Amino acid sequence: MMEGSRQTRVSRPYKISESSKVYRWADHSSTVLQRLNEQRLRGLFCDVVLVADEQRVPAHRNLLAVCSDYFNSMFTIGMREAFQKEVELIGASYIGLKAVVDFLYGGELVLDGGNIDYVLETAHLLQIWTVVDFCCEYLEQEVSEDNYLYLQELASIYSLKRLDAFIDGFILNHFGTLSFTPDFLQNVSMQKLCVYLSSSEVQRECEHDLLQAALQWLTQQPEREAHARQVLENIHFPLIPKNDLLHRVKPAVCSLLPKEANCEGFIEEAVRYHNNLAAQPVMQTKRTALRTNQERLLFVGGEVSERCLELSDDTCYLDAKSEQWVKETPLPARRSHHCVAVLGGFIFIAGGSFSRDNGGDAASNLLYRYDPRCKQWIKVASMNQRRVDFYLASIEDMLVAIGGRNENGALSSVETYSPKTDSWSYVAGLPRFTYGHAGTIYKDFVYISGGHDYQIGPYRKNLLCYDHRTDVWEERRPMTTARGWHSMCSLGDSIYSIGGSDDNIESMERFDVLGVEAYSPQCNQWTRVAPLLHANSESGVAVWEGRIYILGGYSWENTAFSKTVQVYDREADKWSRGVDLPKAIAGGSACVCALEPRPEDKKKKGKGKRHQDRGQ
């Protein structure tokens, strides 16, 4: 028995137990902090006094060093303050210092309109970033039309990127109101004004409003005229109607700005854009672009199941937030089994059938173009041949129409459309007649697969690749499954061939193909992936926000149209249901394109992004 130990009648085993357990005091940290605060308030064991505005705040060095990089450096790298009983903090206020120290000990920060800037100043000086973050959060909630410029100045002084970004968002969301106020016109810097005028998020009724705001700002002070070109280059002059450019904008710019400002060139550029209507898709610059960061999933035309409607002229897009399909400007004419392509931010609709009987006799050669900037359809040059059940590709600065059929039967011809000349030209044709095929673009190459001709028999497995630079078609490894009326698209490094249908070689009865396979152009290899949930012959297809969308379609086995939208997640290799189309429909087309935001979308208030500021 060891001396001083408690005597027992039974000798102690070598180990009382073989198990080991850890016990934790849940309130340990808060209790220690509470006791330290009690000691501080009673003046016990405090080894430093902080001085600001000739007023004193006692504290413990170890707690200050733990909570603040500023104090940690001061007390550990040999500075003289490490040995001083009192440390004067130049640049800190007593109001701010007391609030910050109270927070370090108690974990609560009281902020109001009277102390917020003092607390922010002190917390930034002492590098207590949690307090800085709370200050930014408070100020974000209190931003108003009365104080936003002062808060923007605070954000600049203390390099508060989070607060600065939030105030920028506030100004963008209220630009139509704020930009004409004296405070804004007098105090907003040229750099900030250019940020707002170049933003796709700026709130406005029309582009002319932004021009008026810019001209108002430029004419406030004579020295600002030197920055006229730098400011006005952010105005999207081509989005202003030509008549307004000539009769309102040009006179205003000429009267308000000196000729030396050299800004008339922007107007001349815009007029040239309007004068070359067909060539606009290949005349795109930052000033012709819509002010939006959001691309929409669109569905156009098709053959509907309701007999009274037959063909559709609807153009609608999916509003993901409301999970509803919203109507855009309708097609100039009802169409089904047409093709859609996007070039230069314009939507092109080519060919298709103008009758419910789409066997080829009702094929069209018309090409319509939709401008989302002015929400108008126009007719441009027609294809050389009428086409239905074909594929239309958009590549570089041209469209490529491939195969299909018309009143003369299946086609092998291929033609390209040049917006610059508004004309179609034949290029190398397909090696065989083909219709009911599908296609996609991958790295400037056109790929088509499957399809049929007028010969009796099953559909094809073929995969063809077209290089527009050499005008040559080449065979690639065929699909594992023959199919027609299917869909193709490119996502990541793969090309997907999706669903469709085929004819039974013995009975010649049509059956649905649900299988999906992915092609690797690098390996020239096909791989099976998750099959569709539902049949999809003659459906629309598009890739939107990293997922494949299959819209509507037809089931040959069930003889039924579909309103189902199927969505493929490549990472999970899984199909799921999306938002149903308004009607059951087949023979429609889908695409993804930026659209002019609706008025209610322009006025929605944005939210600032949260991130830690570190005074950088």
Curated annotation (Swiss-Prot):
Pathway: Protein modification; protein ubiquitination. Residues 597-616 are annotated as: Disordered. Residues 46-113 form the BTB domain. Keywords: Kelch repeat, Repeat, Ubl conjugation pathway. The keyword Cell wall biogenesis/degradation does not apply. GO terms for molecular function: cullin family protein binding. Residues 148-250 form the BACK domain. The keyword Chloroplast does not apply. This is Kelch-like protein 36. It comes from Homo sapiens.
